[in-house]
Each structure stands twice: as structure tokens, then as C-alpha cells.
């Protein structure tokens, strides 16, 4: 997955006239190949790493108003070069689910055949506390997923860490239990992994390398064979169970 950090991998600046601007780098779309799984992946690979890329998630929005200035160009270029592409939203604990859903839908380009929208949830313990606790957070996460799913007609997926699953997507948190049972998960888990959720995508490394991209790149693997991958975007929002009373 990519965001503005693949275009701006450091704080390096260059002077242009009277101003200094960040050094930016293009993505060389016709050269993309995975060349390293990174230091945090425990996968053992014989020989050189040189893998093709079949799908790309691009950060679109964050919170109620932040956007990725590179999203539209990267989205169009990825599709032009034949990659399956999806957009993701970085969840904020400082604003409502509805405002964040509005921001995502307004600024993302979901088209038929794209990968399902994804919600990236990575709050710290302090942020959860400031929001009002885990039950408030989970209710807001669920609201975003249901709202976006209803408005786009496709069921989003949930990006979380293994520790988030273990702590919060449990049967003693009603909304957490609902999310675990009814949504596919894109999980960040570094090392060997036996899925204990409805796994869609496994992020096996946050520090991989891809030819054609400057800086580090998250490396992700789809959980399934080619036929399942082709069907991945056809997960209808309307196939979800009716929301339980809250």
C-alpha cells in the first residue's frame, strides 16, 4: 500500500526561489517489482526476491478533512498499468464517523472492479481513552463501515493489528464481536500467522522494498487463490446481516 510517504520519504527539502520545498519522487509504474520483504518479515525466501505486484491500496483520506494530494494521480496511474486498486481511509478519534465517511466518499474514486474500501484503525491507548473508551471507538468504527458500505454498495474491510484484534474484537465488546464476525480483516502481523479472523489481506512487513518506489513500502498478501481474488470486489454490502440493536 502507498501514501504520500512514498513520494516524500524524508524531510529533505530543496530551495526553489525564496522558498524551500520537500523533495518529492515519482512512482515508476512500469518498473514495479517487490525486491525485499523487509527485516520484520519472518518469511524465508530462497534466492533473490523478485515478485510481481497484483494489487495496490492507496491512502485517500484521514479524519474529516485531510486528503492525500497524490491519490488521484496514483489511482489513475495504477489502473492504467493494470493493477487492481483500492482506497483506504485513516480513522481519526477526533471527529465523527459520518464526517469521516463523507470525506472518504467525496475524495475517493471507487469504481466497479476496484478492491473494497478499507478503514485503517490504529489508535493509541491514550486516543481511545480521550474518545471515551473502547466501546465508543468500536461503535464509531462500525458506523463508518456500515455507512460507507451502504452508500457505495460494497462491503468495506477493516485494517487492524493483531494486538487490536486480541484486545478489542472480543465477545465482551458487542460491536467488536460484530466486527470480527461480519467483516473481512486486513491484518498487520509480522511473523508466522494462522488466521483467527475472516482474513482478506495479510500485511507481512512494513519495511519492504519495491523497485520503482523510493523509500520503504508495506508488503501485503491476499489470502486466497486467483478465483477468490477476482471475486474480492463483489462482496456486497447488502449481504451483511441486519444490524443488531445497539
Question: What annotation goes with each model-predicted range?
Answer:
Residues 90-96, 120-128, 154-155, 219-228, ...:
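Low-complexity, flexible helical/coil segments
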Residues 65, 94, 165, 194, ...:
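Flexible, glycine-rich phosphate/dinucleotide-binding loops
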Residues 1-151:
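Substrate-binding cleft of extracellular glycoside hydrolase catalytic domains
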Residues 1-46, 174-246:
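Functionally critical loop-and-helix segments that line ligand-binding/catalytic clefts
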Residues 116-196:
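Catalytic domains of cell-wall/extracellular-matrix polysaccharide-remodeling enzymes
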